[in-house]
Amino acid sequence: MSMQDTFSSPEHFTVLLREAVGGLALKENGIYIDGTFGRGGHSRFILSQLSKKGQLIAIDRDPQAIQVAQNIQDPRFRIVHDSFSAIPDICEKLGLTGKIDGILLDLGVSSPQLDNAERGFSFMKDGPLDMRMDTTQGLSATEWLRQVSEQDLAWVLKTFGEERFAKRIAQAIVGYNKSAVQSGAEPLNRTLQLAELIAQSVPFKDKYKHPATRSFQAIRIFINSELDELEKVLNGALNVLAPQGRLSIISFHSLEDRMVKHFIRKQSKGDDLPKGLPLREEQIQHNQKLKPVGKAIMPTEQEMAANVRSRSAVLRIAERI
C-alpha cells in the first residue's frame, strides 16, 4: 500500500503528500498548522511523525471537513472551524504567536467538494448552484448571480478566471436572469443549467477543456474570497512562524501560484531600501524575512496518472529567517 493510500480517504486522494509534509522539515516535538484539513490526509501524516509532545492545529471552513476531523481522537490534535486567514488570531488566542514550526496549505477545492453535486462546485454534475466553502454563511452563487451587474460579473470572470469571453458570458447570464424575473420563471439555480448557458455563449470550444471551467473557477474564487484569504494568511504567517519555521503551500491555478511565488520572492529580498544608504551586508540580510527552499515541485507522472486532478498542482516551500 502506498503512502497516498494510507493517508488518503476513500473519497479524496491527497496531492503531493510526501513532498508537502516533507517540506515542513518536521520536528517531532514541533507545533504545526494544517490550514486546509479537507479529509485529513496531510494532518494524519503529520501526526504520524510527531512525538507525544508535538501539536497539530487543523483548520477548515467546510462543515463537512469539520465533521471528519472530529473523528480524530488524539490529544495532540485540535480542529478549528474557520478560514485559514484566521491563523494569526487563532495563534494569538492560544499563545502560539511566533512559536509555529510549520504551516501547510492545500489550496482550492477538494475532491469530495467537487464530487458532491449538492455543493455546486462541479459543472459536470447537476446540483444547486451554491459554491460556498462554508455553507453556513455568505451568499451562494445563485444569490450572487441574481444581483450582480453585467459589468461586475464580466470583471470577475476576467480577473479570477482569465476568461477571454467574459463579456459574452456575463451578458448571457445577466440577460437570462433578467428575462426569468420578468416572465415569472426561476433564475439560474442549477450547475448544469449555468454550464450549458456558458457553453452556448462561447464561440470557440477548447477540445481539452470544458467551456465552463474558467467561469466556474472565477465565480467560486469570488464567492469564497479565496485570493483575499490567501493574501491575509501569507502576510500573517510571518508573525506566526518561529525562526526556521516552514511554509508549505500547494496551489492549483496560476493566480494562486503567482501570489505565493511573488510573496516568497519579495520576502526573501526584504523591504525595499533607498539606494545609497550606508548599510552593511548583515543589515540588508537582517531585513529578509523568508528564504525559498528549493524550486517549485510538481506531481510525478505516476501521481498524475493515479489522480488526474493533481496535474495542475504546484508546491512551493519557504523558511522563516
UniProtKB/Swiss-Prot annotation:
The record's SUPFAM superfamilies line, in alphabetical order, gives: Putative methyltransferase TM0872, insert domain, S-adenosyl-L-methionine-dependent methyltransferases
Q: Which residues bind S-adenosyl-L-methionine?
A: G40, G41, H42, D60, F84, D106, Q113
The UniProt record lists the EC number as 2.1.1.199
Give the location in the cell. Cytoplasm
List the InterPro entries: RsmH (IPR002903), SAM-dep_MeTrfase_MraW_recog (IPR023397), SAM-dependent_MTases_sf (IPR029063)
Question: Gene encoding this chain?
Answer: rsmH
Q: Which family does it belong to?
A: Belongs to the methyltransferase superfamily. RsmH family.
Reaction catalysis annotation: cytidine(1402) in 16S rRNA + S-adenosyl-L-methionine = N(4)-methylcytidine(1402) in 16S rRNA + S-adenosyl-L-homocysteine + H(+)
Instruction: Write down the species.
Output: Histophilus somni (strain 2336) (Haemophilus somnus)
- Enumerate the GO terms in the molecular function aspect: rRNA (cytosine-N4-)-methyltransferase activity
- In terms of one coarse class, where is the protein primarily found? cytoplasm
Cited function: Specifically methylates the N4 position of cytidine in position 1402 (C1402) of 16S rRNA.
Q: Which UniProt keywords apply?
A: Cytoplasm, Methyltransferase, rRNA processing, S-adenosyl-L-methionine, Transferase
Q: Which domain of life is it from?
A: Bacteria
- According to the record, the segments passing through the membrane are none
Q: What is this protein called?
A: Ribosomal RNA small subunit methyltransferase H
Gene Ontology cellular component list: cytoplasm
Per the record's keyword annotation, is Endoplasmic reticulum included, yes or no? Answer: no
A biological process term (GO) from this entry: rRNA base methylation
